[in-house]
Amino acid sequence: MAVLDLNLTTVIDSGFMESDRSVRVLTGCFLSVLILSTLLGNTLVCAAVTKFRHLRSKVTNFFVISLAVSDLLVAVLVMPWKAVTEVAGFWPFGAFCDIWVAFDIMCSTASILNLCVISVDRYWAISSPFRYERKMTPRVAFVMISGAWTLSVLISFIPVQLKWHKAQPIGFLEVNASRRDLPTDNCDSSLNRTYAISSSLISFYIPVAIMIVTYTQIYRIAQKQIRRISALERAAESAQIRHDSMGSGSNMDLESSFKLSFKRETKVLKTLSVIMGVFVCCWLPFFILNCMVPFCKRTSNGLPCISPTTFDVFVWFGWANSSLNPIIYAFNADFRRAFAILLGCQRLCPGSISMETPSLNKN
């Protein structure tokens, strides 16, 4: 009977290990595709701006290239190390943990702040186009970009290297695990309450509030401009109808004009909804958890109130935003032509040369 129990236990354990191995392989494949797509998309953006002068000449593209660099750094300095940890089941890089945490905070914050700067740039370009043309020089753009990167460095490396970010260890095991002279296979990135709230405000909540305000104003301005243009078009059509004495078709022409106006407004709304929707869906769940975890108590058996797996899933959701940004922000007609040339597929993908997409770029 004991032999039977032992055999049954062995079968169950081997089945569990096989299932766990399969999950790790699938996870590794999925994360590899995500990392490679992030690298490819953002490398293409950087290469396009570097190679084609007409893309470099537009100041608004300075912000796009800064965003691409920050997302490229996420794919190089942050994602691969975490992917290896997910597959291996432990942190194999030892003392590199603190530097990696600092890179994670810096690159993710830089990506989000660059998105915020882009929204401000586009609002300024649409709300005051003549003033924008005079004032938005390469120097002003570099100052705005430098501000985003400086804030990202200040909020990451200084607190992490000085250990201001860490939650106080609780219990004997955590105190021992925090000692430098003991090896650890876990990269503990748990934050204290002060740092979790302050960093989340700077890295996400304030930028997302600015983006909501700017894109709402952009939609209102675009809506007014579309309706003004449609009114002028209808007036011109009415004058033409009266001149040609073709009153019978006036209602049909006016109806088609209203439909065209509605279509234009819907197009702008869809573009803005995609921009904000993708960003919020990727990052909001993580930052909600980031602020919750330091305040929630551990369960009676000592486990964290939010499982590490759940937290890791939402961390990857946030990083996935870096793979989507090149599609959203650098997929207008100019960039698509450049991508087609770089990839050598002008003949294979002619749609990339001629197709138009709604874009909020000024130029």
Curated annotation (Swiss-Prot):
Keyword vocabulary terms for this entry: Cell membrane, Cell projection, Disulfide bond, G-protein coupled receptor, Glycoprotein, Lipoprotein, Membrane, Palmitate, Receptor, Transducer, Transmembrane, Transmembrane helix
Protein topology in the membrane: Multi-pass membrane protein
Q: Does the keyword Disulfide bond apply?
A: yes
Spans within the Cytoplasmic topological domain:
46-61, 121-139, 220-271, 331-363
Q: What Gene Ontology terms describe where this protein resides (cellular component)?
A: ciliary membrane; synapse
Example of a GO MF term:
alpha2-adrenergic receptor activity
Question: Would I find Cell membrane among this entry's keywords?
Answer: yes
Where is it expressed, tissue-wise?
A: Retina.
Name it.
D(1) dopamine receptor
